[in-house]
Amino acid sequence: MRIRETFPQPEKANIIMDTTYFGRGFGVMVLMDSISGQALSVREVKHETNALYAEALNALREKGVVIQSMVCDGRKGLLQLFPEIPAQLCQFHQVKTVSRYLTRNPKTAAGKALWQLALTLKDGSKVAFQNALQAWFEQHQGFLNERTVNEESGRSHYTHKQLRSAYLSLKRNLDYLFTFEAHPGLGIHNTTNLLDGKFADLKRSGVSSRDEKGE
């Protein structure tokens, strides 16, 4: 199956962008317009990079497409590529990030509480979530800041590194998790789920056979 790189361009677009892989060194990077539900840019890549995303976005802008917003998975530096464009971090991917640090079954009370809080992302507002995250921090600050001393070197490190990473990820990304709420008139999606569904369709349609056959 051949992959077209460009499609008919709308005047305005809310971009959802991500890359899926069909094998080692064969990925498909897609920029989709959530307003029309159409892909605007599709290209084969070996690895996704911020430079490739920037190139694809700039190509659309050069064709006159007004990028009203963009939604992505939170790849480091990607949200900051175009500060003039409202950028939404996929809430589903944020929850996945927290689960990588805490697992889906944390052992500590603080971890369990933070995991349950992360699961409320899709249901609440920025103010409510921010207040709840601050309340969690105030309740568990002592535990979060516990340090373990290495008896041989005398140096110390945070005891609960994974918990700290999960908390700091939520705190650091807070401004990007509710962009859709700050721009209600644009109809920005809060996840990349619409594009994820298209990726599933691509895989069912046999794009992966291209990689298997070496085409």
Name every feature range the model reports, one short phrase each:
Residues T19, T108, A128-Q130:
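Intrinsically disordered, low-complexity regions enriched in Ser/Pro/Gly/Gln/His and often acidic
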